[in-house]
């Protein structure tokens, strides 16, 4: 089973930071305080949407066809995603 | 088919495809209405008028009750939405949203509505106390009226979803603009239809 990367604190709902990174081959552990990349702060569905968007060469029409959704539905999903990214960027500042 | 698709098929169908099916819906509704004497005097009303009018009148009426609301909702979408709104989405989904009224046109074939109307006219307008009607006609007319009410609710829900999806509006803004658009559309289509009826009748 693929583990989901938690991005929100289950206790208080706040944003999580990366405290340590581990190398499996040499077993080195790096400790510190790193913020998550913006892409990882998005939900799984939103990440999948971006991947699909890139794979469709940014064509919403092609995406709508492959997802079996109407063009305005896909465009609305993109607009909502743009809004969320803008919001996350503002929060990071 | 999922029940949600009956009220919101626009997540999957919009644009030119919806416009094509919408035109088919309007053709069927107009043709059925011609034979069943079912009129649509404004965007949401259904009326039974047993009077001969040419087929072209029924088709033009269908175009009027689709074109005017589509135009009004398109302007409202441009005003309220920050997304890019495509004309074909608004006009297409608004056309397809009219599919419940095919059933309304079919319900017009029920003679009970006419007999119930004639009975009420005789009783209350002409004070004819000898007027009679069968229990079957009363029950059928009430059932048909109730079904027509449900069809109107269905149509309005479809139109709201058509507007919401095509314009990417949400919450109070979507509801507010839709209610305003609906109100203006009803008045505008009613006035144009009165004028049209005068031309043909």
Where are these regions (language model features)?
Chain B
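Membrane-helix interface motif
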Residues: 34-44, 109-122, 195-198
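Alpha-helical transmembrane spans of integral membrane proteins, capturing the lipid-embedded, hydrophobic core
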Residues: 22-30, 58-71, 94-98, 102, ...
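Hydrophobic alpha-helical transmembrane segments and adjacent short intramembrane/lumenal linkers
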Residues: 89-178, 184, 188
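Juxtamembrane boundary at the C-terminal end of a transmembrane helix
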Residues: 187-201
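Alpha-helical transmembrane segments and their helix-start/interface "positive-inside/aromatic belt" motifs
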Residues: 5-25, 88-99, 172-179
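Hydrophobic, aromatic-rich alpha-helical transmembrane segments
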Residues: 15-19, 47, 51-59, 63, ...
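N-terminal juxtamembrane cytosolic/stromal segments of multi-pass membrane proteins
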Residues: 1-53, 76
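Alpha-helical transmembrane segments with an aromatic anchor "belt"
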Residues: 49-123
């Amino acid at each position: 089973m693929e583990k989901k990367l938690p991005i929100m604190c289950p206790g208080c709902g706040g944003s999580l930071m990366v405290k340590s990174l581990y190398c499996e081959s040499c077993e080195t552990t790096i400790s510190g305080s790193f913020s998550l990349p913006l892409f990882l702060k998005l939900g799984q569905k939103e990440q999948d949407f971006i991947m699909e968007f890139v794979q469709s060469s940014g064509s919403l029409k092609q995406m709508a066809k492959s997802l079996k959704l109407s063009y305005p539905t896909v465009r609305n999903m993109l607009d909502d995603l743009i809004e969320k990214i803008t919001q996350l960027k503002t929060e990071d500042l | 088919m999922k029940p949600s698709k009956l009220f919101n098929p626009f997540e999957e169908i919009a644009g030119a495809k919806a416009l094509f099916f919408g035109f088919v819906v309007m053709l069927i509704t107009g043709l059925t209405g011609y034979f069943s004497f079912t009129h649509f005097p404004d965007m949401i009303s259904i009326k039974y008028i047993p009077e001969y009018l040419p087929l072209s009148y029924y088709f033009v009426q269908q175009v009027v009750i689709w074109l005017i609301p589509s135009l009004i909702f398109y302007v409202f979408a441009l005003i309220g939405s920050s997304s890019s709104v495509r004309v074909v989405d608004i006009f297409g989904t608004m056309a397809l949203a009219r599919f419940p009224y095919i059933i309304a046109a079919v319900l017009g074939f029920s003679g009970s509505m006419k007999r119930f109307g004639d009975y009420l006219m005789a009783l209350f307008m002409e004070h004819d106390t000898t007027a009679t009607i069968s229990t079957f006609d009363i029950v059928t007319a009430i059932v048909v009226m109730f079904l027509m009410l449900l069809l109107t609710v269905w149509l309005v829900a479809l139109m709201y979803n058509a507007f919401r999806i095509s314009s990417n509006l949400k919450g109070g803004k979507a509801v507010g603009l839709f209610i305003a658009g609906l109100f203006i559309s009803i008045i505008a289509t009613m006035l144009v239809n009165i004028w049209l009826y005068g031309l043909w009748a």
